[in-house]
Amino acid sequence: MDKVVKIDGKDVKFRATARTPRLYRAIIGRDMISDMNRLQKAFNPDNAEESNLDVMNLQIFEDTAYIMARHANPDMEEKSADEWLDTFNMFSIYEVLPHILELWAINTRQTSTSKKK
């Protein structure tokens, strides 16, 4: 699934598919599912500014945003999250993270019903 988010006055396209966790592991070197579980637990969608977002959670957010943007734009010139973040003057975690979590939730929700009762 794709989603366009306005960041620092620019339209940025993000993509989350079954391939996204593989890209994350190959490029970032960590398990995306574990990282996203940690990030989801720390983020309070009802009051974003009261979320428990430490330095590691910020790193996970930045890496995830970069991977989803790179997945949507394979010809992206920036080869690291740091290079990509340098293209923005302002990149608010509180504005972008809800969109990233929404994409992740849509991508990971169960699409079939369990046959066990």
Regions found by a protein language model. Give the residues of each.
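N-terminal first-folded block
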Residues: 21-28
